[in-house]
């Protein structure tokens, strides 16, 4: 059995115990109590699966948490703030653009647009986004630019469907790259976007995608009506 699985269960058991003591003092609100009940069922199921006693795991979890707290400073307890990173200038973000052969796809809460008339171009993807815990948090806007500075693609959040994850953004970027590469364009991603959206990338600045994914994704892009 993986040691991280066991220690994670032990810490979860102890933290549930702390929350239960809090609720016993009639300090928890309705959502708090509802989560407490659901988590209790979950812990019982995990305990049965792992073959671990919850009471014993709770004691072990207490020791782990106490050891961590002994090493913590007040500074470390502060919640990190989001950082806003910009690849694009204000002019690049606000500039209007026109598509000769418009294609559009909605992927979750993100809208992907591209001009399929663009062929045999070198294209770079730039984005403005926020970061927390050194990971992409919220995409503000992503645009695809040719070497001449023309905008040929875009990914933007849908106002009517707020909320997306870094995985949603990476999947949307994969769709956009696939569509652009289908027309023999060469696409690379800005260094800032690579750093915070992917842990690794190809030498040419292209994020890693499964083999043949670009053709599969290109076929999924639906015509804009």
Swiss-Prot record:
GO terms for biological process: symbiont-mediated suppression of host cytoplasmic pattern recognition receptor signaling pathway via inhibition of RIG-I activity; symbiont-mediated suppression of host gene expression; symbiont-mediated suppression of host mRNA processing; symbiont-mediated suppression of host PKR/eIFalpha signaling; symbiont-mediated suppression of host type I interferon-mediated signaling pathway. One of its GO terms (molecular function) is protein serine/threonine kinase inhibitor activity. Residues 200-225 are annotated as: Disordered. Residues 218-225 are annotated as: PABPN1-binding. InterPro entries: NS1, NS1A, NS1A_effect_dom-like_sf, uS15_NS1_RNA-bd_sf. It holds the Pfam family Flu_NS1. Its main location: host cell. A motif (Nuclear localization signal) lies at residues 34-38. Residues 1-73 are annotated as: RNA-binding and homodimerization. A motif (Nuclear export signal) lies at residues 132-141. Residues 175-210 are annotated as: CPSF4-binding. Upon interferon induction, ISGylated via host HERC5; this results in the impairment of NS1 interaction with RNA targets due to its inability to form homodimers and to interact with host EIF2AK2/PKR. Inhibits post-transcriptional processing of cellular pre-mRNA, by binding and inhibiting two cellular proteins that are required for the 3'-end processing of cellular pre-mRNAs: the 30 kDa cleavage and polyadenylation specificity factor/CPSF4 and the poly(A)-binding protein 2/PABPN1. In turn, unprocessed 3' end pre-mRNAs accumulate in the host nucleus and are no longer exported to the cytoplasm. Cellular protein synthesis is thereby shut off very early after virus infection. Belongs to the influenza A viruses NS1 family. The dsRNA-binding region is required for suppression of RNA silencing. Homodimer. Interacts with host TRIM25 (via coiled coil); this interaction specifically inhibits TRIM25 multimerization and TRIM25-mediated RIGI CARD ubiquitination. Interacts with human EIF2AK2/PKR, CPSF4, IVNS1ABP and PABPN1. This is Non-structural protein 1. The lineage of its organism: Viruses, Riboviria, Orthornavirae, Negarnaviricota, Polyploviricotina.
């Amino acid at each position: 059995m993986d040691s991280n699985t066991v220690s994670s269960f032990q810490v979860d058991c102890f933290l549930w115990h702390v929350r239960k003591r809090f609720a016993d003092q009639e300090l928890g609100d309705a959502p708090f109590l509802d989560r407490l009940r659901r988590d209790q069922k979950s812990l019982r199921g995990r305990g049965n699966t792992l073959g671990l006693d919850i009471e014993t795991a709770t004691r072990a979890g207490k020791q782990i948490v106490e050891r961590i707290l002994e090493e913590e400073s007040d500074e470390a307890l502060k919640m990190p703030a989001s950082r806003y990173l910009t690849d694009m200038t204000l002019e690049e973000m606000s500039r209007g653009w026109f598509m000769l052969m418009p294609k559009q796809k909605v992927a979750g809460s993100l809208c992907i647009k591209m001009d399929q008339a663009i062929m045999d171009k070198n294209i770079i993807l730039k984005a403005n986004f926020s970061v927390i815990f050194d990971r992409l948090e919220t995409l503000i806007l992503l645009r695809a630019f040719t070497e001449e500075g023309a905008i040929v693609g875009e990914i933007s959040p849908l106002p009517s469907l707020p909320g997306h994850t870094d995985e949603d953004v990476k999947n949307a970027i994969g769709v956009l790259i696939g569509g652009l590469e289908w027309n023999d364009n060469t696409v690379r991603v800005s260094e800032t976007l690579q750093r915070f959206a992917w842990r690794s990338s190809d030498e040419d600045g292209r994020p890693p995608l499964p083999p043949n994914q670009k053709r599969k994704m290109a076929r999924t892009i639906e015509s804009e009506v």
